[in-house]
């Protein structure tokens, strides 16, 4: 007989996989072991015990053996003796029945009756139990054996266990306990900032990733102290870094598909179907396991008898085992149905770390999907602590804090130079994103002109910043930077531009008001009315050299501090994010303004206060709610106005007074509802750029030929059917945007535009292109924006010239 301990082999998987087994899989595995025991026990008994014991029947009625002669006599007044040639004698007392059969005949009868008359369910019951149990085990463990899933599971478990046991995770939890049990007292704010000023230079980064956020009072205190505990050694740090890389690659690989989820779902469905099948036929056939079996076989010529009464010795035990087996299958099936319900009820292909993000400092922990999410859901059924610890290695903030342990060694000068880029202003800039601090090697980049610090909490600018003699621009995006006195003295004399992006107004460092040489200030964040009191600070009024002020916020009116510094401003830009801006009379005080941008301020009319700003050269009223611009007549007093941007509004028509703006060089009226262009517009003879795209125009007036200085014309996405010949008198045209109209043809006079470098024709009803396009000497194939089949209508020599021009440029 097989030892019970050997049966565990069929149910046990690799020990490491136990964390992927929810409680229902554990239950079903143990139930399967019990089922195997039933099968082995029943099969062993069937092999070792007598299968059937049969005796001939002397009294037979209708092929049925009567229990006694009296029963036979009562049922048959004229008895017959079909099963024997011997006449029965009256029962005169208890006498035995003797048969003249030998042992071999009995064995033969037992075998024949067992094979032919015993019901198949009673005969094969142990083997059926064994077969069904093996199928259950195969379904439960197939995903651990199938190569496409087992490889992912093995890799996942390996990484998960390493992350769980990583010193980085352990020290992070220890740091959390320290922070909770030993908060800094509130009164140490002043002492900490004064007595430890020198220690804040090149502040050591925390060695651990705290699992809980610091208390609000600690953040408000702004204490910067040196962490002396929890520093990983180099080997542990490298191991943790390698884990981060493994997690990234594994996540990228596993999130591509959902084969693990689908296979687990299918094997669960198969088990439910199998359960229903077993219950249906087992309950139906279990009553066929009987102790007494009548056996009628045609072997009278061999034994002298035709009917036998047989006993099935294992019937009672098999019926008990069958009942127990049915109860186990029912329990097994209920667990499988619960598993299926769990999988259908929950979105298992998405896993959110929202709770961990809320209770920790890892607000950037990404949600995962597909097989990665499903495996994490299974892990949560085993122990949610695994996924919480694993989440540390999904956070970029956590990774950056780990790097900070050896920041100066990792961020070598050569590595930082590789991150240097040229911005749009052709300045050399370095962007540091989500680090734990500023590497000391940054201050060896003496050629650096722009330094961007984004999402760097609790950073302290050290005195060594004075080495960056070329630094003129600093960006602080969600970075409440502290600064030491020598560093502030350097920035006060050298910094020219400062960009600050914040969520809370308190993130704006107070030391910026000491930057007396500052010329540009960009503020992006919440500056609503209830927060205005925070920015009415006398220090900002000391920025006497401020020339450019950009505000991207949700103001209801201009803060007083803006008005105070506006006397010497040259450029003011307000992007109000769709909030209505009222009370603009204070603009009159900004007499030195040359550029004014009021973007997304929900303006319905052009503010009258603008008309008194006689130095204005550019006005941008993008994305407001302008429906009429009758006030444009007052722009004639702005003699220096060269650029007017009224785009992304709801303007229905252009007033004829626009012709008074004779100095206008650029006019943006795209994304409006204009249906007609007044002739007076073409009195603006200095126009070089005219954008009327995305309107409702149906034609271009012939007077457009008056714009002899026009270099760029855009009428994309209108309903223009034809181009006036006068358009091609604008010989200085370099770009002509005509896409998405209803043009039927392109005039051959297009060849007269000898300065044309770009023409857009896509989305029209053109059937062919004029050959005269080849007469535009500066036009290249890349500058001809048109459908490929339409381009093919050009003669080969024209196409060849356009292609050749592109190649020559390359």
UniProtKB/Swiss-Prot annotation:
LRR repeats lie at residues 411-422, 423-445, 447-468, 469-492, 493-515, 518-542, 543-565, 567-589, 590-613, 614-637, 639-661, 662-684, 686-707, 708-730, 732-753, 754-776, 778-801. Disruption phenotype: Increased prenatal and postnatal mortality, growth retardation, and multiple tissue abnormalities. B-cell development is slightly impaired, without affecting B-cell function. Mice however show a cell-autonomous early block in thymocyte development and impairs peripheral T-cell expansion and function. Conditional deletion in germ cells leads to abnormal sperm and male infertility: the cytoplasm of late spermatids appears swollen, preventing reduction of the cytoplasm during further development into spermatozoa. GO terms for cellular component: cell surface; lysosomal membrane; monoatomic ion channel complex; plasma membrane. It is found in: Cell membrane; Lysosome membrane. N-glycosylated. Changing residue 103 to A: No effect on anion channel activity. Impairs channel selectivity, so that the channel is also permeable to Na(+) ions. Changing residue 47 to D: Abolishes activity in hypotonic solution. Residues 1-22, 143-264, 342-810 are cytoplasmic. Disulfide bonds join 54-310, 57-65, 113-295. This is Volume-regulated anion channel subunit LRRC8A. The lineage of its organism: Eukaryota, Metazoa, Chordata, Craniata, Vertebrata.
